[in-house]
Amino acid sequence: MTTPRQSSLEPLSIANWRWQPFLDHACGALQPLELEPYPVAPEFLLQTSQTGSKSKPVQVTTATWACKTNKLRQVRAACVEAGAAASVLNFVVNPSTSYDLPFFGADLVTLPAGHLLALDLQPALKTDAEHTKAVWERLMPIFERWQQRLPGGGPIPEEAKPYFSPGFLWTRIPLGSEGDALIEEAVKPAFRDYLELYLQLVHEAEEVSPERSAELLAGQKRYTSYRAEKDPARGMLTRFHGAEWTEAYIHGVLFDLDKKWM
């Protein structure tokens, strides 16, 4: 991909990118929701650079697909393709605080040491049963179905636990044919199941009171502030595109709630 993108809603295709089928599925599943472009500055719609050595340079492509709907403040896909160095899809749905909905989060990362893959419907108010109970009752059977097919990803840091549900599906799998098979046979259908449930919740969601909306906003801000501060992609993006671009991307696109309003 070298042609400049004109809109965040413009179809996004990156050559040889492992996660293209996942993004294509998500974009297709969202189509019935009357999508509108989400404002993203041109330098974040598509950015290219090189990594590797002078003798063996590797092309890096970082691109953003994004939209919004009446119930979803921001839907965005951060996409990175850098050959053997990295292949990433970070797909997040940020709901409007006018609706009592969790976040949808998918982090699909391929690095030289293996694949790190995570799916969740992340709560804005984890200790609030009104926010979580009905979601978790429907999420846990899906989680249990796919958890038994995948190796565990390891412990969650204590400080991160408020931002993940009991249905957090987190796995580390090896590169090569074994990992490829697990991605095709377990990770891909799990991604579809998690997204399907999320879109069902969006369809069913009804507008909440201004008081409830304020509570949800406070919870969302805690989540996005934490994610912006602890974003594990910061080092990789800085290496590829520099610190100034990376900080602007993290705070102005990926986790922009403090800069935007409904």
Curated annotation (Swiss-Prot):
Q: Give the enzyme's main class according to its UniProt record, as a single word.
A: oxidoreductase
The protein's matches in NCBIfam families, at most eight in alphabetical order, are given as: PRK13249.1 (NF009722)
HAMAP family listed in its UniProt record: PebB
Per UniProt, the keywords (alphabetical) are:
Oxidoreductase
Gene for this protein?
Answer: pebB
Q: Which family does it belong to?
A: Belongs to the HY2 family.
Q: What is its EC number?
A: 1.3.7.3
A single GO BP term for this record reads: phytochromobilin biosynthetic process
Reaction(s) catalysed by this chain, per the record, are: (3Z)-phycoerythrobilin + oxidized 2[4Fe-4S]-[ferredoxin] = 15,16-dihydrobiliverdin + reduced 2[4Fe-4S]-[ferredoxin] + 2 H(+)
The molecule here is called Phycoerythrobilin:ferredoxin oxidoreductase
Which InterPro entries does its entry note?
Answer: Ferredoxin-dep_bilin_Rdtase (IPR009249), Phycoerythrobilin_Fdx_Rdtase (IPR022827)
Pfam annotation, one family: Fe_bilin_red
GO MF term set: cobalt ion binding; phycoerythrobilin:ferredoxin oxidoreductase activity
